[in-house]
Each structure stands twice: as C-alpha cells, then as structure tokens.
C-alpha cells in the first residue's frame, strides 16, 4: 500500500470502528449501558452507600443533591439548587455535566442522545 493511501485506510478503519461502537450502543439495553458506563461510580441498589458518585436509586424526580453523606461540589449545589432530576435535566447532565454545573466533579459525557435516553429510561424504572 502506498504512503498516500495509508492515512485514508486508517481513517476508514477508525470510522468503521466508531460506527460499530455506535451500533452496539444502539442495541444495548439501558441496564447494560448503565453497567458499562455508570456503575463504576454509581450504586443503583436501594440503600447502598454512594461510591465515587451518588446512589442513583430513585433518582428521577428526586431533588438534586439530596443524598445524605455525599459531598457534592459547591458548583453543583449552586447550579442545581431547588431543581429535581427530571428526564430533561438528566439528559442535559449526561450530555455534558460541565455545561450544567461548571466545575462539578463528574467528568463523564455522553454525546449520543439514544444512549442517554436508554440510560434515563432505565433509571426511571429503578424505584
């Protein structure tokens, strides 16, 4: 393969890899996506202690920052004071937490709306 074709082949391979990952995410359940992308930091079982992030059991509809014993950042407390975790707010949060509360501890971002929706739909059913 010539040197001029190698970058193109690499770019095509990378695009195919991204497309395959996107398709796999589209076919995964919200529970699977939660386990893959959220469970390392967040517990989901009722009464489980928080991990790196707060316990997300019953998060939909709960006031933001309402987990006893979890130390939210000052930025989080200021930006989300008086707000509850609606599906819409969770969607914005998962897309880019720093846009919702600049300086918050959470760094995870999910650009894919279908993945965010699947995770949020899963969280709606954890009560």
Q: Which residues are covered by each model-predicted region?
A:
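Bacterial N-terminal signal peptides that target proteins for export
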Residues: 1-10
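Cleavable N-terminal signal peptides
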Residues: 11-13, 23, 28
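Periplasmic/extracellular electron-transfer cofactor-ligation site
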Residues: 26-82, 92-102, 126-127
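Short, exposed beta-strand-loop hairpins at the edges of beta-sheets
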Residues: 108-113, 120-126
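ATP phosphate-binding glycine-rich loop and adjacent ATP-lid/helix-beta elements
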Residues: 86
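N-terminal signal peptide c-region/cleavage motif recognized by signal peptidases
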Residues: 18-21
């Amino acid at each position: 393969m010539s040197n001029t074709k190698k970058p193109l082949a690499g770019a095509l391979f990378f695009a195919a890899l991204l497309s395959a990952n996107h398709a796999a995410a589209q076919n995964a359940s919200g529970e699977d996506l939660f386990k893959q992308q959220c469970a390392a930091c967040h517990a989901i079982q009722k009464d489980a202690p928080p991990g790196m992030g707060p316990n997300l059991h019953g998060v939909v509809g709960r006031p933001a920052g309402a987990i006893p014993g979890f130390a939210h950042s000052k930025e989080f407390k200021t930006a989300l004071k008086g707000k509850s975790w609606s599906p819409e707010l969770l969607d914005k949060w998962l897309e880019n937490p720093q846009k919702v509360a600049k300086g918050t501890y959470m760094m995870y971002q999910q650009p894919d709306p279908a993945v965010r929706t699947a995770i949020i739909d899963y969280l709606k059913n954890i009560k």
